[in-house]
Amino acid sequence: MNLELLESFGQNYPEEADGTLDCISMALTCTFNRWGTLLAVGCNDGRIVIWDFLTRGIAKIISAHIHPVCSLCWSRDGHKLVSASTDNIVSQWDVLSGDCDQRFRFPSPILKVQYHPRDQNKVLVCPMKSAPVMLTLSDSKHVVLPVDDDSDLNVVASFDRRGEYIYTGNAKGKILVLKTDSQDLVASFRVTTGTSNTTAIKSIEFARKGSCFLINTADRIIRVYDGREILTCGRDGEPEPMQKLQDLVNRTPWKKCCFSGDGEYIVAGSARQHALYIWEKSIGNLVKILHGTRGELLLDVAWHPVRPIIASISSGVVSIWAQNQVENWSAFAPDFKELDENVEYEERESEFDIEDEDKSEPEQTGADAAEDEEVDVTSVDPIAAFCSSDEELEDSKALLYLPIAPEVEDPEENPYGPPPDAVQTSLMDEGASSEKKRQSSADGSQPPKKKPKTTNIELQGVPNDEVHPLLGVKGDGKSKKKQAGRPKGSKGKEKDSPFKPKLYKGDRGLPLEGSAKGKVQAELSQPLTAGGAISELL
């Protein structure tokens, strides 16, 4: 469907479930590319599954990590993908080839990775129990961002919409606004509750359009701010949030929050159950609650950049939420007026005449001018939904879709193959060519596949024994404790299946005598064919 024809006056948020995406392995995190055509899903077995969101099919699978993937981010042009795993490794991938460009090893677990919105050479990394780090991919250098206090342990960070500033938040509710190029402090403020008590910052998310951003805090309140007001207040300012969003009834803590594609709605996923709360940003009222399967916990939420579609992850499965599409089979007149019933059209006088003698001279010249107007059919206008408010043109080198080639397996028998006498000569030729290939590979004429460069990032004062939150709590003995004795319910049985077939030994189990016994034994010693020994036995 053309994005220009999407209905923009009705409700622009999903209303019901619209199926699931099964990645075979357990899904942990997901993110859309800039156009919403591809969805990258990080899995528990270290693979990255890229879905074609238009066909709802798997377009590519990248065997990225050995440990679970905990964070993903697309580059601006869609050609690169950066991922982080629970073994403290950050990798950049080429989406088309699936190859790893480079790899970074950190001393502590990684909570979040994010590309610079306008410069894909820079990546923001949020390590656990450390200050945020900005990587420069071209020279493999890193810069540790300044924090408010050296005792800050859990610091979250995010680029703003254009990447000009970096917003950081710590466990004491302090927000710092740093200039991306120089890391200079531009503005700062503290998030407080009703009194002077502070609350920890859990995440910072920016809208794709406009200057608004939200802060998810530990007091279970989502605060929406205007970035322009933050910069105006300067250091140690006291800006007031535009909206405060919360669940007053259940006091629900929030696992993940994000804006809609147009920035008019905010969705928050509950940390207690698979439930999505949707608010309207302008007035702050709750417009919809989407309930998933009871008893499941939510892991991640992502809103489609263009359409009113939400992807959520729970129990390792990606759930899709969309609007209820009502089909309209009505008839329409040529002027797009909807018709309730068939109406016989009454032609006006001289309506379809080539030359209208009754028209006045001014009207005729106006019609001639309209007919002589040239229509441009070669230039392509940029789609406003894909462009930011400060851009005029689309990226011509963007990767919107992945080409898919069918995987053809070699058949056992080729009915269209060469005659038998030609097969022998071809086999001899193949043997000679294979020997040449071995010799050339031994000589080293074929270059091996280039291994990605691995860079160790050293951070001072960071403990090396931290455990990622996805894997559990540090010092948790439940996961390491082995069960003593026999497994529950075995009662001395074999470990294999009780329905294991027994082998035939001698004449045991054959209550036949004489010639019948010998005939059956002879038939059992031969392979069974359709209509052969079985039909004789019957």
UniProtKB/Swiss-Prot annotation:
Pfam families with a match to the protein in the record: WD40
Compositional bias annotation for Basic and acidic residues: 491-510
Region (Disordered): 344-377, 408-538
Cross-link (Glycyl lysine isopeptide (Lys-Gly) (interchain with G-Cter in SUMO2)): K129
Outcome following mutation: V377E: Reduced ability to stimulate KMT2A methyltransferase activity in association with WDR5 and ASH2L
One Gene Ontology biological process: transcription initiation-coupled chromatin remodeling
Region annotation Interaction with ASH2L: where it falls in the sequence: 330-366
Residues recorded with modification Phosphothreonine: T252
Tissues and organs where the protein is expressed, per its UniProt entry: Ubiquitously expressed.
Basic residues composition-biased segments: 479-490
Keyword Transcription assigned: yes
InterPro entries found in the cross-reference section: RBBP5/Swd1 (IPR037850), WD40/YVTN_repeat-like_dom_sf (IPR015943), WD40_rpt (IPR001680)
Lyase in keyword set: no
Main location: nucleus
Location in the cell: Nucleus
Mapped WD repeat ranges: 22-63, 64-103, 148-188, 196-235, 249-291, 293-331
PROSITE patterns assigned to the protein according to its UniProt record, in alphabetical order: WD_REPEATS_2, WD_REPEATS_REGION
Subunit and partners: Component of the SET1 complex, at least composed of the catalytic subunit (SETD1A or SETD1B), WDR5, WDR82, RBBP5, ASH2L/ASH2, CXXC1/CFP1, HCFC1 and DPY30. Core component of several methyltransferase-containing complexes including MLL1/MLL, MLL2/3 (also named ASCOM complex) and MLL4/WBP7.
Function text: In embryonic stem (ES) cells, plays a crucial role in the differentiation potential, particularly along the neural lineage, regulating gene induction and H3 'Lys-4' methylation at key developmental loci, including that mediated by retinoic acid. Does not affect ES cell self-renewal. Component or associated component of some histone methyltransferase complexes which regulates transcription through recruitment of those complexes to gene promoters. As part of the MLL1/MLL complex, involved in mono-, di- and trimethylation at 'Lys-4' of histone H3.
Name recorded for this polypeptide: Retinoblastoma-binding protein 5
Native organism: Homo sapiens (Human)
